[in-house]
């Protein structure tokens, strides 16, 4: 049984993320989507919200489970007995960072491989950062995220706008 881990911040979980999960779940016996705490990135959604959102989107995949983690990826990979780390590459700009991370992961986990998947054409330009910016500026994100994720975004953006109106 080959277990793979697909780690990320998933802030928010996009159609591009789901595309990679769908494809990776067809390759591996079990896929663990690891939602990283990532405090240095100052996520828009709290860790528990991101886990909940990912579970809403991915609940219909029988061989996929979603777990949150903090700390080193190597510890999460070991905890889940994974033999592969799945990473997405959208563009050449992603490659340099991901290549360095794969090298470090190989050093820390010599018996674990990193597998890169490129997104389907319609998802190559989607990033969580772009989706958050569009949502915060009142734009339509429905083509980039699932309806449940869009509802979370609209609610969160509305709360933040209401809070900033109170302080202004």
Swiss-Prot record:
Q: Tell me which cofactor or cofactors this protein depends on.
A: Mg(2+)
**Which positions bind substrate?**
9, 41, 73, 87
Which Cys pairs does UniProt list as disulfide-bonded?
Answer: none
Kindly report the protein's main subcellular placement as a broad class. Answer: cytoplasm
Query: Which Gene Ontology cellular component terms are annotated?
Result: cytoplasm
Name by which UniProt lists this protein: Phosphopantetheine adenylyltransferase
What is the native source organism of this protein? Ralstonia nicotianae (strain ATCC BAA-1114 / GMI1000) (Ralstonia solanacearum)
Question: Biological process GO annotation list?
Answer: coenzyme A biosynthetic process
Where does this one sit in the cell? Cytoplasm
Q: In which pathway does it act?
A: Cofactor biosynthesis; coenzyme A biosynthesis; CoA from (R)-pantothenate: step 4/5
């Amino acid at each position: 049984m080959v277990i793979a881990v697909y780690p990320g911040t998933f802030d928010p979980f996009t159609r591009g993320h789901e595309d990679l999960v769908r494809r990776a779940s067809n390759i591996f016996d079990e896929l663990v989507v690891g939602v990283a705490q990532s405090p240095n990135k100052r996520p828009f959604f709290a860790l528990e919200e991101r886990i909940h959102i990912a579970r809403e989107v991915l609940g219909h995949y029988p061989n996929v489970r979603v777990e949150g983690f903090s700390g080193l990826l190597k510890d999460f990979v070991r905890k889940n007995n994974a033999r592969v780390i799945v990473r997405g590459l959208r563009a050449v700009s992603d490659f340099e960072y991901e290549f360095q991370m794969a090298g470090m992961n190989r050093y820390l986990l010599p018996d674990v491989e990193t597998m890169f998947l490129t997104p389907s054409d319609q998802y190559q330009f989607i990033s969580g950062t772009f989706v958050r910016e569009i949502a915060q500026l009142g734009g339509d994100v429905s083509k980039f995220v699932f309806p449940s994720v869009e509802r979370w975004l609209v609610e969160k953006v509305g709360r933040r706008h209401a809070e900033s109106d109170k302080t202004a």
